[in-house]
Regions:
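Short helix-to-coil "ATP-lid" hinge immediately C-terminal to the conserved N-box Asn in the Bergerat
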Residues: 73
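Short cysteine clusters
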Residues: 48, 67-70
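N-terminal pre-ligand scaffold of iron-sulfur
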Residues: 1-62, 76, 80, 89-108
Length: 108
C-alpha cells in the first residue's frame, strides 16, 4: 500500500529502539532511520548521501548521528552535515500511546 506524503505510518513501539540508538525501517518503499534521543525522537533518510552508509547503525551523540562508513556527522533535527554541504531529509516523528509514528518528508 502506498502512503500519501501527508499520511502518518506506524513504525514500531518505544521498546523497539533503545535510547541513543537508531533503527532502519522501510516506510512506503523508502528507507528511513528512527532514533531515540534523551529528549525525544528523530527520523531521517537512512542512507548517508556520501556513499549510502547506513545511518541507522551510526553512533548517536546528543542530537547527531555519525555515519559508520566514513564518519560524516548529521544533525538529527536539521538533517545538515557538520562541516559539509550534504543534507538528509528529516521526517516528522511522534510517540503516541507507546507507538512510534512517522510522516515522510518530500525526498531530498
Amino acid at each position: 500500500m502506498s502512503l500519501a506524503i501527508d499520511a502518518w505510518a506506524r513504525v514500531g513501539t518505544v521498546d523497539d529502539v533503545p535510547e541513543l540508538e537508531g533503527r532502519s525501517i522501510t516506510v512506503d518503499g523508502r528507507r528511513i532511520a528512527v532514533f531515540r534521543l534523551p529528549t525525544g525522537w528523530a527520523a531521517i533518510d537512512a542512507a548517508c548521501p556520501h556513499l549510502g552508509g547506513p545511518l541507522g547503525d551510526g553512533l548517536v551523540a546528543e542530537r547527531c548521528v555519525t555515519c559508520p562508513l566514513h564518519g560524516r556527522r548529521f544533525d538529527l533535527v536539521t538533517g545538515e552535515q557538520h562541516g559539509g554541504d550534504d543534507v538528509v531529509a528529516v521526517h516528522e516523528i511522534a510517540e503516541r500511546h507507546g507507538e512510534i509514528w512517522v510522516r515522510l518528508a518530500e525526498p531530498s
